[in-house]
Amino acid sequence: MSIHINAPEGAIAESILLPGDPLRAKFIADTFLEDVVCYNEVRGMYGFTGTYKGKRVSVQGTGMGIPSMSIYATELIESYGVKNLIRVGTCGSYVEKVKVRDLIIAMSACTNSNINLVPFKGRTFAPTASFDLLKPAYDIAVEKGFEPKVGSIYSSDIFYDDDKEDWKTWAKYGCLGVEMETAALYTIAAKYGVNALTLLTVSDHFVTHEVTSAEERQTTFKAMMEVALDTIVNL
């Protein structure tokens, strides 16, 4: 048991999906998993364990932002021995060729957060995905015909940015899109020597201004979820 996860020892699988939205966690459990047990409801942040294609897997909501992701990733690793963490979330696209509903595999994460400037004493740490998860996820996505886009993304501490042109700098340097958690996930995974990966579905677009609905973000984007789960099965 940890401060924010009220689960007994052994209740959480070694491989876990991490949606930000706890209702998406419930949707994944209800849609894809068998023999499901809810192990956490603390703060309304649902966690479930079940089986997918015969393999034990968990799914845990993390909330929004780097601090919240940091809490859940740390507790899952330290208190429950989780070894493989795959974030399944949404992002805004920075580049025209990456369309709404496209699948992004985040190879690395830039950030405006101070999460790494403090422990690294002002020096820059480059948070990157685990190749042991990235490679099979990419292969599985291609096999399924999803045409994944692989590259860097931007993890921002600011959702409502007063600088409406700032995103263009990140796009110029190759960032495919923006979300709010991956830099923390990759950093914490590196700290503890475990595997982490982020899969993102594009929910809105900075260039075309196309958006998806809140309901669609919560209950669809199944391609991303299938790729994440099949990656775990193939570990």
Curated annotation (Swiss-Prot):
Cross-referenced PROSITE patterns: PNP_UDP_1
Annotated phosphate binding sites: 20, 24, 43, 87-90
Domain of life: Bacteria
Cited SUPFAM superfamilies: Purine and uridine phosphorylases
Keyword DNA-binding found: no
UniProt GO molecular function: purine-nucleoside phosphorylase activity
InterPro entries in UniProt: DeoD-type, Nucleoside_phosphorylase_CS, Nucleoside_phosphorylase_d, Nucleoside_phosphorylase_sf
One cellular-component annotation, GO: cytosol
GO BP terms in the entry: purine nucleoside catabolic process
Binding site for a purine D-ribonucleoside: 4, 179-181, 203-204
Catalytic activity: a purine D-ribonucleoside + phosphate = a purine nucleobase + alpha-D-ribose 1-phosphate; a purine 2'-deoxy-D-ribonucleoside + phosphate = a purine nucleobase + 2-deoxy-alpha-D-ribose 1-phosphate
Cited Pfam families: PNP_UDP_1
Function comment: Catalyzes the reversible phosphorolytic breakdown of the N-glycosidic bond in the beta-(deoxy)ribonucleoside molecules, with the formation of the corresponding free purine bases and pentose-1-phosphate.
Official protein name in the record: Purine nucleoside phosphorylase DeoD-type
Organism in which the protein naturally occurs: Clostridium tetani (strain Massachusetts / E88)
Gene behind the chain: deoD
